[in-house]
Amino acid sequence: MISKEYTFYSKRLYDFDEDYGDKKILYFDIETTGFSRENNHIYLIGAAYKNADGSFNIIQWFDDTGKDEIKILLLFREFLKNFDVVADYNGNSFDIPFVIQRGLKYGINFNFDKYEMFDLYKKIRPYKKLFKTLSLKQKQIEIFLKRVPLGVHAL
């Protein structure tokens, strides 16, 4: 398993702090070997959070052997405890159910009910007509907004 952490600065990101006050926000994304929660596994979890100076820390847990899914899930669950708000893109439909199901396989309980949730996909979906031909896939929204990618960065 590889764990990597780095910091970046960006003035182009929307400042969600204004919407959430003093609450600590964790942005996260997962990468999986497929869409089946039962047959496929999570090989990467990326998480980002804002520092007091406006910079962002990014941490990634990568299962480079195909045998460390349990390790990255345990590390993510422990890390998650430090936050109040969980932000993602289509996480309510994909990422969170996938994490919960894969955690249950190993006896790891993820209780997302205690967090305030922010799913960017659900926020922009009502405005789909404004995006014309876009499918609202994460990559297309990133290109459209010309922003720092919402997902994880390559190791």
Residue ranges and their predicted role:
Residues F28, D88-G91:
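Short His-Asn-centered micro-motif
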